[in-house]
Amino acid sequence: MTDDKDVLRDVWFGRIPTCFTLYQDEITEREAEPYYLLLPRVSYLTLVTDKVKKHFQKVMRQEDISEIWFEYEGTPLKWHYPIGLLFDLLASISALPWNITVHFKSFPEKDLLHCPSKDVIEAHFMSCVKEADALKHKSRVISDMQRKDHKQLWMGLQNDRFDQFWTINRKLIEYPPEENGFRYIPFRIYQTTTERPFIQKLFRPVAADGQLHTLGDLLREVCPSAVAPEDGEKKSQVMIHGIEPLLETPLQWLSEHLSYPDNFLHISIVPQPTD
């Protein structure tokens, strides 16, 4: 991996100013004030909203409280998607703060997974990390790690500790110099215009002739509608961590520097905003 810690830090410490408001039909004993929070892009909603939950529960009766869930403009927010991905996919062109509605009843069973504890988040996160390593290294790296290393990865994310996390995670983004990159790039492409949750296929970072594949190469192969023809109008934005990388950027570099802590590149394809 190229030593570019500033990029890694910028990604890790990315924040989204957010205003949480209790749904108007929730029964409260007194008015519920909105709650403001800077959400870490790399984390998960159910991991960083304990204060939000406590804030609104203070004005509610115990019998009116069941599992908390969140929505944005009518769309339930999937807790197992990283926060930055949710924002890029659903709210990237909206004004800040991001306005999220909080619910304590009518859980949308068809749209969301239940999240009864942080153990469920940890299990999901580690499952993604293991899947990513299977793609990158045939699971060699994660299998060679000890249980305490897996725990350190998780605790680094949970406690927002950059160095604690990256001490272990750097091993997951190394590769033999003679290979020029990972075996396959762990990526998922999300679109608001389709019912399909995401696109995920096997894609190598290096072509047969030794040339590095780019973000544009990936999109042209697996999601060609996201790439404007040379003489055509640009209809889509390709977002990773709130930025629009150049299509000429090598995929290997993106995977090393702009992957989320679960080691996947989460790529959002959203309609090009109109002025």
UniProtKB/Swiss-Prot annotation:
Signal peptide region: none
Processing after translation: Conjugated to ATG12; which is essential for autophagy, but is not required for association with isolation membrane. Acetylated by EP300.
Gene: ATG5
Full protein name: Autophagy protein 5
Keywords: Acetylation, Apoptosis, Autophagy, Cytoplasm, Immunity, Isopeptide bond, Membrane, Ubl conjugation
One GO location term (cellular component): phagophore assembly site membrane
Oligomer and partners: Forms a conjugate with ATG12. Part of the minor complex composed of 4 sets of ATG12-ATG5 and ATG16L1 (400 kDa); this complex interacts with ATG3 leading to disruption of ATG7 interaction and promotion of ATG8-like proteins lipidation. Forms an 800-kDa complex composed of ATG12-ATG5 and ATG16L2. The ATG12-ATG5 conjugate interacts with RAB33A; this interaction is bridged by ATG16L1 and promotes ATG12-ATG5-ATG16L1 complex recruitment to phagophores. Interacts with TECPR1; the interaction is direct and does not take place when ATG16L1 is associated with the ATG5-ATG12 conjugate.
Task of the protein: Involved in autophagic vesicle formation. Conjugation with ATG12, through a ubiquitin-like conjugating system involving ATG7 as an E1-like activating enzyme and ATG10 as an E2-like conjugating enzyme, is essential for its function. The ATG12-ATG5 conjugate acts as an E3-like enzyme which is required for lipidation of ATG8 family proteins and their association to the vesicle membranes. Involved in mitochondrial quality control after oxidative damage, and in subsequent cellular longevity.
InterPro entries reported in the protein's UniProt record: Atg5, ATG5_HBR, Atg5_HR, ATG5_UblA, Atg5_UblA_dom_sf, ATG5_UblB
N-acetylmethionine PTM positions: M1
Classification via Pfam families: ATG5_HBR (PF20637), ATG5_UblA (PF20638), ATG5_UblB (PF04106)
Protein's GO biological process: aggrephagy; apoptotic process; autophagosome assembly; autophagy; cellular response to nitrogen starvation; immune system process; mitophagy; piecemeal microautophagy of the nucleus
Topology of this chain in the membrane: Peripheral membrane protein
Superkingdom, taxonomy of origin: Eukaryota
Positions bearing the Glycyl lysine isopeptide (Lys-Gly) (interchain with G-Cter in ATG12) cross-link: K130
Family as reported in the entry's similarity comment: Belongs to the ATG5 family.
Subcellular location: Cytoplasm; Preautophagosomal structure membrane
Species the sequence originates in: Sus scrofa (Pig)
